[in-house]
Each structure stands twice: as C-alpha cells, then as structure tokens.
Amino acid sequence: MLFGGHCPGGIKKALDNAHAFGMDAVQLFVQSPRAWRFPEHDPGDLKAFRKRREELGIQAVAVHALYLLNLASPKKDFYEKSVTTLRSTMDAACAIGAEAVVFHVGSHLGDGFEPALERVAPALAEALERCSDTTWLCMENTAGTGGTIGRSLEELAALYEALDRHPRLGVCLDSCHLFASGYDVTDRGELDKTLAQLDDLIGLDRLRCLHVNDSKMPLGSNRDRHDNIGEGLMGEGLGVFLAHPKLKGLPAYLEVPGTDGHGPDAEQTKKLRELYARATKASPAMPTSGRAGSARASVGNDRSTRSKSAGR
C-alpha cells in the first residue's frame, strides 16, 4: 500500500508538501479547482516536477480533474467547457508523468442516465485520445447524491462498455462514497462481494487507486461528507477496506478535512498508517523514500499486465 493524499501547491509545491507529510504518493490539481481557466504551464516547471519527484522518491502521482466538470450536463456551454478542461488536464498529467487522472463524471441534472451516457462517452473518448502509455483516466464512484453518475458499480461498468473497454480507462474507488451509496466496505464479507462484483463487471486490473476517507454520514445516506481517519462513522472499520489483500500495492489518497481543516496532513497520514498496521496486525508502514522506480513499476506495469480486456 502506498500512503498519500491530496496536497496543495500544484505542480510547483505539491510534491514537497507530500514529502513533508510523510507520504509515498500525491494527488494534486494542475489548475485552480475553483476556475475554468486552464493555465499555460511552463515546460520547465513540468520537467522540474519529474526531477523533483525522483529526488523525493514519490512513488505515485494522480491528478484530480476540476470539481466543476460535468460531462453529463445537458447544458451545451457547460458540457463543452468540461470536455475542453478534461482534455487539458490529461495533457498536463501526461507531461508530468502522472499515473492517473481522477475525475467525477458529473450529474445528468434530472435528464436520466441513458441520455447522459450519450454525452459522457464521446467526452471520455476525446480525453483518452490524449492519454499516454502510462497515464490512466480513472472514473471515481460517487455517493449517489441527486443525478450524479457513478453511484453504483453498474453505472461505472456501463461507461466502461460504452468506451469499448478502452485499455486506459480505469477506476478510483472512494471509501466514503462507497459507504454513502450503500456498499458496507467496513464488513469483510460485504467488501469481498463488492470487489468480486467490480472484478466481474470491469476487472480489478482497472482499479488504479483509492481515496481513503471516513464518512460523517451513515451507510446508504447518499450524502458526500468526508471525515478524518477514525473520526467518522466508518471508524476502525475503514481498516477493513484499507487492508483488503486485493487492494494491496495501490496508492491510497487521503481527501480528509485534516487536523486543522486544511486537508490531508502529517497527522492524518500517521493515523492512516497506524490504521493499516492494526488492520494487518503489522508494524506501521514507514515512508519508503528512494524506491520510486520499483514502486512505480508495481503500480503501473505489473498491474497492467493483468488486464482482462482481451478476454472479456
């Protein structure tokens, strides 16, 4: 398991923040999360990111797409801005050598899933055309609020099939979202069933990363409210999800409020490691700085060789 979190600072500072927090992996934005305007990144900054990553031994990098994106929107202007921004995000992620771009599909705004699917599929196809050999485009499951797409594994599978099982279309599972949408991943038996369903519908080889968050809201509430490690309703049960053997080796990114309300930090990273240690009855996993090459191969190439796309 690689322990990381969503860190501030963008391309210039996120790596150093992650390192200071004792993380093995980092998730970041490559633009302001609150604005549509996409910056023109200096090629020197993109190159410097790759070099700094090697220096710090950060083993996995994910870029989170803009929260404003709505690839399912029936509103033409909003939809077109979303498609353009996702393309630009993919370009930047490939340039810095990120293993994944994680995105929220969006909401059909009451228009229904099937009409939305007809909009989402070509948008994803455009983004995937820009995908490098090492960067995955990862659909994130949702808590199921309103008309959001991705509330169930079946909805993610429908997108996967609509894209003809594209070899670089992956999945990011968020523990809080799973719990809120009715998947009790704090129970080993239920988690086994969930992962078996994912394997059957899409393939576990397509699961590229995790968001590990506790939940302020109860099971099946369809409300997306992340909580700090050990402070929410999932509690110690979050360790069941974190330590499942079929998730071994994946980057686990925190997206929690943080000790001081400013997001993932050193204290939350420590609690995540300790929870994993208790769940696996082992000593707390320590930062593995300096082993970036081997870990990157484990996260990327080793898992991709197990792809089921040819046989499905």
For each feature predicted by the language model, list its residue ranges:
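C-terminal helical cap(s) of enzyme catalytic domains, especially alpha/beta-barrels
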Residues: 262-279
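Non-cysteine beta-strand/loop elements that form the S-adenosyl-L-methionine
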Residues: 24-29, 59-63, 169-175, 204-216
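Gly/Pro-rich active-site loop or hairpin
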Residues: 114, 149-157, 179-249, 257, ...
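Active-site acidic/histidine proton-transfer and metal-coordination neighborhood
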Residues: 71-170
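Conserved, mostly hydrophobic/aromatic
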Residues: 18, 64, 82, 93, ...
